[in-house]
Swiss-Prot record:
Protein name (record): Phosphoenolpyruvate carboxylase
PROSITE patterns linked to this entry: PEPCASE_1, PEPCASE_2
Keyword Lyase attributed: yes
EC code(s) of this entry: 4.1.1.31
Catalyzed reactions per annotation: oxaloacetate + phosphate = phosphoenolpyruvate + hydrogencarbonate
Annotated source species: Streptococcus gordonii (strain Challis / ATCC 35105 / BCRC 15272 / CH1 / DL1 / V288)
Pfam families: PEPcase
Amino acid sequence: MSFNKLESFSNKEVIREEVSILTDLLTDVTRKILSPETFEKIAMMEDLAVHSKYQELKEIVEELTTEEMVYISRYFSILPLLINISEDVDLAYEINHQNNIDQDYLGKLSTTIDLISTRENAKEILENLNVVPVLTAHPTQVQRKTMLDLTNHIHTLLRQHRDVKAGLVNEKKWLGNLRRYIELMMQTDMIRDKKLKVTNEITNVMEYYNSSFLQAITNFMVEYKRLAEERGIKLDNPKPITMGMWIGGDRDGNPFVTAETLKLSATLQSEVILNYYIDKVYTLYRTFSLSTNLSETSQAVAEMAALSTDKSVYRENEPYRRAFHYIQSKLIQTLLYLKEGNFSNEGQRLTDRAEKTLSAKTTPSLSNKGREIIPNYIQSRISETLTELKKEETPSYKTAKEFKEDLQVIYDSLIEHHGEALVTGDLTELLQAVDVFGFFLASIDMRQDSSVHEACVAELLASANIVKDYSSLSEEEKCQVLLKQLLEDPRILSATHEPKSELLQKELEIFKTARQLKDALGEEVIKQNIISHSTSVSDLLELAIMLKEVGLIDENGTRVQIVPLFETIEDLDNSCETMEKYLSLPIAQKWIASKNNYQEIMLGYSDSNKDGGYLSSCWTLYKAQQQLTAIGDKFGVKITFFHGRGGTVGRGGGPTYEAITSQPLRSINDRIRLTEQGEVIGNKYGNKDAAYYNLEMLVSAAINRMVTHKKSDAHTSNKYERIMDQVVERSYQIYRDLVFGDERFYDYFFESSPIKAISSFNIGSRPAARKTITEIGGLRAIPWVFSWSQSRVMFPGWYGVGSSFKEFIDQDPENNLAFLQLMYKRWPFFKSLLSNVDMVLSKSNMNIAFEYAQLCEDQNVRDIFNIILDEWQLTKNVILEIEGHDELLAENTYLRDSLDYRMPYFNVLNYIQLELIKRQRNGQLTPDQEKLIHITINGIATGLRNSG
């Protein structure tokens, strides 16, 4: 049975009505800001764009003064943003509406659980499933937080308008509020003057927990258990969704991530979740006014109530209230101990700092960063409670388990005394939240490049006179040295090594901080350490040496899992050999056994794409998962995959449900992790309705892929794979011949794209390249993909696809085309692959791309565009042939209509950006005026709804 996507239920008429209102308001605001002459030019440009008269549009743009471009660029940047807001509101509305009328849609949780409810292992599947979205600081969110806040205000107003009956809306007041926020948008800086710091990235992401994640995940957990129980499946402690975090721990290529940012990330996360609990417990305190005159309580609740510092005579007969007051006091005390804690004392628990806190002369306060993300009313409540806490030494919680046990005491008492209806809602939700978030909120990954680990280990070995030049050893010799250190030498090599290099000192401090955080906040706070550019077993063992230095690993087990990240085509091809050797090591087997026999492997989508093109990347990743899963089976190890996907197709992006359900058979057991990056976080999780829906998609897709085994998968997979091997080999050659084989390509890319402006764009704390860029290989994947998106070529998402399939079809035109069409209908992987190419082609614009090619001064370099254009046309023709369609996006009319609506406006921005780049290169722009290029980058990314 097939279901429609939720987007297919969208109300296009309502969206157009809303956009018309928003556009009229924007037009009115703009008219009052600009001169009549400039405003008239905007009206002309808009009309020309809507009617695709781009040559005339180009001529007007060339005549604009730079001053006129300031507000014109803003106008055409805000227009697609307003369309996006209306579409997002419509999606959020439909999520609620379709659930209320019990309408099935693709990925609906109830339908998914129905699918497996009669299976013998249904309880095992639902109990053990764990899907982990990992939020990263990859710099693809071009919007300032201030602009995002204004966007949210407009979203809220539109949503309120839909939720209230038309006759009850004060239309004049509502329009006035909309106008105010649009006017603020038009006169607020859209881009950052200063580069983001890691601390900014941490606090920005924390906002999403307060606005969406905490409530959405809690609601999802309650619904997950309820749906299972309705079908006779009693779940004990499921965790279908938990959260991961890279910000503060991902130091690969980012020198600004330090031990301090790691500690800040962990402590701010704890502040956020503790304050969430404090707020929820306060709500329960206000709600549970049950009187002993009218109801009974358990002895345990009575004892807890007696410990409360709330001695008001008005509550002496309200034991539940006093019990919740006691719990709240303990939570506040826990928060204060966290803030006062000095993590330099290893092993110190939160409660061990009670005496220091209570004897402090001044009231402990939240950190400055904490104040940015914690609501004022909670800060006030904490301050009001401090006086009571100091009079009597209220204990704190050592662990989240203790907190849950206190809540469970109240829950059990209510059940025991006929309060089944009372426990539903806030109390049940809070119990579920504690299961998911603990006191840590999200597990922070640490990540570093393998070359850094090698340099640190080489220094340690040389300082101890073990090996003078470790880096010169062969792979076999390296492994021998490392294993001897891990198995036979108990020394902490860094203890006697002084002075240490700056690099080694920094790395050791981060690992020490990780241990201190685990000791203080629990094992869940940091669980994985990822090794970028993993190429060999020694890369994994070098990290083990670093972990050994701080006591996070020994010969019997590890407190942090070692996770290799295979990124390039070559590394992915060699990953099976690397992991087979690693899994055969007895010490590695003990480490894995200490992690319940799971071994995580991270897969890099971005670098493999830049290395070999879209088709080669996708297929290499697919085969690697198949082969690595088989190697895990050989050693009795459950291989789990961490998918390092970006927002764009060129970086592994695309529709989430299809991406997961098209993974190889058995590659998803009961765990899967995937990155959520940059602008994707806001698009998917910007409000609690959207967050719930996208979490539902993740979990439903994982369950479906775990249990769905189509006969066609096994029956025809060998033939499918042989065809893919042949096509991909040719695609790889075609891609590499141009990108790395044609000496003109480097100049073409840097001259025909806004890469220099993107590299100076303040959209993240991380540099645009790991080193000085002298070749394509040295450029990070994000600016690479971002630049091609801006120039509207979308090169990483399709180049090499057309020629490779055309050559295969031409070998036997009648049979080969028919078989590819069959593959498209029957093989989820192949359908997802081509659908993504279809989507990318629909966002490209070769007429605009031609204009960017004209930025190249040398005609010989400029001719590269003709190669790209020919391949684009061939790819489009082949894709449509295989799909059996006459136009792109024939199976995704929602996106097609959305792009048709938005595209004329951000097309205008491309022509403005082109003119600005020309003027910049001619020295006609001041440094301040050059920022206009960034505004156009922002607007185009907004229109495309993705960037890097």
